Amino acid sequence: MSKRTSAKYKLDRRMGENIWGRPKSPVNKREYGPGQHGQRRKGKMSDYGIQLKAKQKLKGYYGDVTEKQFKRNYTEASRMKGDTSQNLIGLLERRLDAVVYRAKFAPTIFAARQLVSHGHIRVNGVKCNIASRQVKPGDEISLGSKAQEMALVLEAQGLSERDVPEYIAQDGGAKVTFVRVPTLDEVPYPVKMEPNLVVEFYSR
């Protein structure tokens, strides 16, 4: 198991949930945290602890984005009109690596980020290697010609545990269009996400 894969499943164990809905997640077999003390009964969490866990889970789901990037997203969301928690989800779903993952161009969010950083993704026909780039409604996201034959891309397209959401329109197997910014209810999270608690965490 690679270091990144091991770290990914460690996050699952720490959260006690199958964050990405993967069949091989260790929490499908056990429901306690990593390490030798993982089976100890956990005490009641404080409000701060609950908020922190919600933040770690959401941040981890999107490939463990840096705290600097994540807080920047929160700050931008808080300045936008409307509900801050919904705005935050919209900004996270507009990340280029997130759209690549949702389009089933990659089997994991980490692989999606690699595809972007290695120059295999096009936005409106132009190569883009910035995973955090904000995609806009109407933008076309496509795979480069070499990427279309990659094993990980073919693996992702064959995955049955997740579907391409309605806010992303498919155009063949190598191109999608980002139709609209989704609401929280539209995002196909395998586990419950609570962005309202993330807002409370940063509003302390």
UniProtKB/Swiss-Prot annotation:
Does the keyword section mention Cell membrane?
Answer: no
Which SMART domains does the record associate with it? Ribosomal_S4, S4
- Kindly name one Pfam family recorded for this protein: S4
Specify the protein name.
Small ribosomal subunit protein uS4
Q: Where is this region: Disordered?
A: 13-46
Instruction: Give the S4 RNA-binding domain ranges.
Output: 94-157
Entry's Gene Ontology molecular function annotations: rRNA binding; structural constituent of ribosome
Q: Per its UniProt entry, which superkingdom is the organism in?
A: Bacteria
Q: Which residues pair up as cystines? A: none
A single GO cellular-component term from the record reads: small ribosomal subunit
UniProt source species = Rhizorhabdus wittichii (strain DSM 6014 / CCUG 31198 / JCM 15750 / NBRC 105917 / EY 4224 / RW1) (Sphingomonas wittichii)
SUBUNIT field: Part of the 30S ribosomal subunit. Contacts protein S5. The interaction surface between S4 and S5 is involved in control of translational fidelity.
User: What broad taxonomic lineage does this protein's source fall under?
Assistant: Bacteria, Pseudomonadati, Pseudomonadota, Alphaproteobacteria, Sphingomonadales
